[in-house]
Amino acid sequence: MAIEHASSIKKVKNFTLNFGPQHPAAHGVLRLVLELNGEVVARADPHIGLLHRGTEKLIEYKTYTQALPYFDRLDYVSMMCQEHAYSLAVEKLLHCEVPERAQYIRVLFSEITRILNHLLALTTHAMDVGALTPFLWAFEEREKLIEFYERVSGSRMHAAYIRPGGVACDLPANLCEDIYLFCQQFASRIDEMEEMLTNNRIWKQRLVDIGIVTAENAFAWGFSGVLLRGSGVAWDLRKTQPYDVYNRMIFDVPVGTQGDCYDRYLCRVEEMRQSIHIIMQCLNQLPKGMIKADDKKITPPSRSQMKQSMESLIHHFKLFTEGYTVPNSETYTSVEAPKGEFGVYLVSNGTNRPYRCKIRAPGFLHLQGLDMMSKNHMLADVVTIIGTQDIVFGEVDR
């Protein structure tokens, strides 16, 4: 009788579920193959490459100036931070000194970009979990910041403003005053968002103790940015390896304790507050002077010069068609982008085009840790974990 009972017990197989790529919580074109034991995740297998455009190869066929706009289109939520990394890499190869005013403007817009990114990351994450209102409120603030982008570069998203040697053009009249007014009222907007989320019972139930990453695991998987700091590691390239004028800025690095989704949320909120402090310091310390390097090999002549001098017109034409040559060398340069460490490994062979440009996208490394983060969690928690990773597929697939 016992033998008959044992033979009647059937082995239950795990259930395979395709999540995305047309899912609103997939944050782009993520195809996730989930192996489920009931509603518990046994394995998560991300399939990437659906947004691959061959960016790194395309850069090899462009001059150093023409390659710049590709960086706006990688992580299309934090545009200027990526331009910043590429420009620093080219300047390192050229041994080019950037004027002080240009450095302050770069830092100013890098922090504006950080707020832009975190507003989108936090509110889309909240929307995935079920809170719609913060998303609608945050986009009102994002619109103001995008207008600053538009006023300085003429473009709302793909600015191509931070360039090797400095910035494209000087700040327009009254822009600093408007940024100052924005900073004064933005802290209260963050408070309003925190009132809705931080101590909300449902929000905490969905985030606390979900997707825990220990400091050891964060290092092992190559995590950076908020995913590393949320695990209790105070690593921020703006502090540890300062670039431009970050060594003159006074700000704190927010660090978590548990390494869960809730800690990462708190880190992002505090980072926005710290970005306001940095922006205010940039506005107060902004010096007068040049905004482009005083090197005619790299810097194009001004419009007024071109209208008066034929040599300047020829110089401008050759600079944007042929470009400038960069000495035989290689460099790895990284910046603290909103999503983590964004790095550019640039190899020059002495011509006017890069021999190789390898991009270190933080989202690519974070996504490969999704299986580790979501194991033994419920299916609904996978959405929370993807939201807290802050993935954008422009940089993941490249």
Swiss-Prot record:
Pfam families: Complex1_49kDa (PF00346). Its EC number is 7.1.1.2. It is found in: Mitochondrion. Disulfide bonds: none annotated. It catalyses: a ubiquinone + NADH + 5 H(+)(in) = a ubiquinol + NAD(+) + 4 H(+)(out). Binds 1 [4Fe-4S] cluster. [4Fe-4S] cluster binds at residues 261, 267, 282. The keyword Translocase applies. InterPro entries: NADH_Q_OxRdtase_suD, NADH_UbQ_OxRdtase_49kDa_CS, NDH1_su_D/H, NiFe-Hase_large. One of its GO terms (cellular component) is mitochondrion. GO terms for molecular function: 4 iron, 4 sulfur cluster binding; metal ion binding; NAD binding; NADH dehydrogenase (ubiquinone) activity; quinone binding. Keywords: 4Fe-4S, Electron transport, Iron, Iron-sulfur, Metal-binding, Mitochondrion, NAD, Oxidoreductase, Respiratory chain, Translocase, Transport, Ubiquinone. PANTHER family: NADH DEHYDROGENASE [UBIQUINONE] IRON-SULFUR PROTEIN 2, MITOCHONDRIAL (PTHR11993:SF10), NADH-UBIQUINONE OXIDOREDUCTASE 49 KDA SUBUNIT (PTHR11993). This is NADH dehydrogenase [ubiquinone] iron-sulfur protein 2. It comes from Nephroselmis olivacea. The gene is NAD7.
